[in-house]
């Protein structure tokens, strides 16, 4: 979820359909219990056996965790190639070492015994498995005056505008909703890495049909009318995909909770505008890693600016759950201040979420500052 720190964000350009207004989905209650603490966990680094799941859930219960966001589809190209899954899928390839170990099934069984909810965390277009299936669907960017496949740091991304890719990704979401008693499905990697993508031929043609000019003629390094038009179009395509995914999943399981992890709204180069897809989800999780981007703590809780201000302004009537790194020993007082100010300035926020990239140990649970 967070490795984009080294190359900021990822791709996402979705359906070429025009975004049509639909009635907003009634917001579901995330929880009736105030001030809950949730965690997000990567599967490859945490779960190799059933015993690993049981021990993890015991720790989560001990440290009063209300929700576990489980990585059911690999998010990065590291221990496992991106896009490989950790459940019994007939759609996506199962990760090596997990063909006889259904992590999602095991987690639901153990967590529900402890009254802990399980949300399936499903990254979308950072997907080497999909690229292997559809080799012509790789994301394209601009280098000099040439369009080239985007393969930053050995990472693999597919073009979200590709119809086959869209259908494939949504079929995974539907499979999870149909086969498993998950309490929610949460999407990630719904974004671009920069203004210069996607620039595949099909995307360029679709935008040119709408605007009258080829996007490769845009000066991407400056803030200008054409770049703003391009970015507005990209954000609308992303919203159109979320709309399609939401409707498809809810046709499978009507009342399932749906959400999206987002980058700070001020990162406009990522082509992600929660204001355009808020009506199709119940929860938004803004990634509030203030230290990673050299912001002060007030950037999180500011009453007139900052990530929560921007998110609430765009996503009115949508539940907001800010996501944080675990605090270091020198950050604990800062986190206490952040939470106190957040409760004052944003009283509707009732939950926070913690994420770490590696393995959750008891020493990590002990670092939790409760909301």
Task: For the regions a language model picked out, list residue spans one by one.
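Sec-dependent signal peptide cleavage junction
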Residues: 15-30
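Active-site-adjacent "subsite" loops/lids of carbohydrate-active enzymes
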Residues: 31-40, 48, 119-120, 125-179, ...
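Aromatic-lined substrate-binding rim segments of carbohydrate-active enzymes
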Residues: 56, 74-126, 226-252, 301
């Amino acid at each position: 979820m967070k490795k984009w720190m080294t190359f900021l964000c990822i791709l996402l350009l979705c359906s070429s359909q025009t975004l049509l207004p639909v009635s907003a989905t009634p917001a579901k209650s995330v929880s009736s219990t105030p001030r809950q603490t949730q965690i997000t966990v990567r599967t490859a680094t945490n779960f190799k056996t059933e015993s690993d799941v049981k021990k993890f859930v015991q720790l989560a219960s001990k440290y009063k965790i209300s929700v576990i966001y489980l990585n059911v589809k690999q998010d990065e190209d590291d221990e496992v190639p991106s896009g490989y899954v950790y459940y019994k899928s007939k759609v996506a390839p199962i990760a090596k070492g997990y063909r006889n170990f259904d992590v999602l099934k095991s987690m639901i069984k153990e967590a529900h015994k402890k009254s802990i909810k399980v949300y399936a965390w499903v990254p979308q277009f950072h997907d080497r498995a999909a690229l292997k299936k559809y080799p012509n669907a790789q994301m394209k960017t601009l280098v000099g005056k040439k369009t080239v496949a985007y393969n930053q740091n050995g990472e693999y991304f597919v073009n979200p505008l590709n119809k086959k890719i869209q259908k494939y990704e949504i079929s995974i979401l539907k499979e999870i909703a149909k086969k498993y008693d998950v309490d929610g499905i949460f999407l990630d990697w719904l974004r671009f890495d920069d203004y210069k993508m996607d620039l595949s031929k099909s995307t360029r043609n679709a935008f040119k049909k709408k605007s009258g000019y080829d996007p490769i003629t845009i000066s991407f390094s400056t803030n200008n009318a054409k770049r703003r038009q391009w970015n507005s179009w990209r954000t609308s395509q992303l919203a159109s995909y979320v709309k399609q995914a939401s409707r498809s999943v809810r046709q499978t399981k009507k009342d399932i909770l749906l959400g999206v992890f987002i980058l700070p709204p001020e990162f406009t180069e990522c082509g992600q505008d929660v204001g355009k897809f808020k009506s199709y989800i119940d929860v938004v999780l803004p990634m509030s890693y203030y230290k990673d981007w050299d912001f002060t703590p007030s950037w999180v809780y500011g009453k007139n600016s900052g990530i929560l201000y921007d998110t609430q302004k765009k996503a009115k009537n949508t539940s907001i759950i800010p996501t944080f790194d675990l605090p270091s020993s020198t950050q604990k007082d800062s986190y206490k201040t952040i939470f106190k100010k957040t409760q004052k300035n944003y009283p509707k926020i009732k939950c926070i979420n913690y994420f770490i990239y590696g393995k959750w140990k008891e020493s990590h649970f002990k670092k939790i500052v409760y909301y």
